Amino acid sequence: MKDTEKKTEKELVWDECVDILENVKANSFKATLEYYLASDKKTKKAKPAKVKKVKEPKAKAVKPEQVKPTKTTKAPKPKKPKKQGGLISQWKEKLEAPYRTPYVEQKQGMVISIDKMWKHVHGEDSKEQIAILSDVSLEIGYGEIVIILGPSGSGKTTLLNLIGGYDSISLGSCVVANCPLEKCTTEQLLTYRKLNLGYVYQRYNLIELLSAYDNIAISQNLIPKEQRHLDIEELAAKLDIKEILYKFPYEMSGGQKQRVAIARAIIKEPRLLLCDEPTGALDSNSAENIIALLQAINKEYKQTILMVTHDETLTRIANRIIKISDGKIVSNELVRPLS
């Protein structure tokens, strides 16, 4: 993956849902990033060009005596239409090929395998490179709840973004769900995220113009109908948001918004749920409810959960606690093995 300009959280959310907005119930939604980011710019619709009517020349009448008799011949046999299946499958193959992710084997039971991974950024002097993650090696098993602790600027969110395929790896390897992220193109990373990831942000990042139902439906539409096992209304009932399902984000409390964001993340049944400070913007009661909810989700859906946080109280639900300082893992402890 090539280095790209750092995107805002809202732009990352937009990248994840822009391809499937046409499937959402809100017909009035204007699918442009500028409108989503509350830009004042207005786009003008181009007027259709006027098409001049062309008069067709009248056919000249032919007198009967001018028509010469012709010899009767046998009608040719109709040619069998050529089969188009081969061409269609080739065309489909060309369209899908750029999005097909590479595959490598992992140890049995492992969902994340990181080996000597580095992340460099350019400093104020463009010639100088600064390491914000250094020589990170890590293995995480399916179904673990992993808490990543560390002070601000230690590299916690960078690690989460690299695992999520939102940032490029400078050196080393990062294999998630058999997909080597360092070898992926931008298109392949999009497929990787659609198939494997759910992301919960600190500031919820719900689309303000859509109801809770439609915010969740955006994520559900990333997977084919035949692969959907969760119903939005049933999931909403489990997450205690059924009463606000058709309300808009501005009508919700912080805790309700975070529950909708979690529902949006897990509706497509991802293998990995990434949470960036999931309780950071909540009061203590709402935070406790979200902690209990994440624990219940892990138990019921067997999803691996990675949480970046400053809140050490979250460690009580962890299987694994990772501490990061100055871009290095200083501690990686399995505190509660999976049963």
Swiss-Prot record:
Pfam families cross-referenced by the UniProt entry: ABC_tran
Keywords: ATP-binding, Nucleotide-binding, Transport
Basic residues bias: start-end ranges: 42-53, 74-83
Molecular function terms, GO-annotated: ATP binding; ATP hydrolysis activity
Binding-site residues for ATP, renumbered to this chain: G150, P151, S152, G153, S154, G155, K156, T157
Residue numbers spanned by region Disordered: 41-87
Keyword Mitochondrion attached: no
Domain of life: Bacteria
Compositionally biased intervals (Basic and acidic residues): 54-68
Alphabetical list of InterPro entries matching this protein: AAA+_ATPase, ABC_transporter-like_ATP-bd, ABC_transporter-like_CS, MacB-like_ATP-bd, P-loop_NTPase
TM helices/strands, residue ranges: none
Domain (ABC transporter): residue spans on this chain: 112-338
Protein family (similarity comment): Belongs to the ABC transporter superfamily.
Stated name of the protein: Putative ABC transporter ATP-binding protein MG467 homolog
Organism: Mycoplasma pneumoniae (strain ATCC 29342 / M129 / Subtype 1) (Mycoplasmoides pneumoniae)
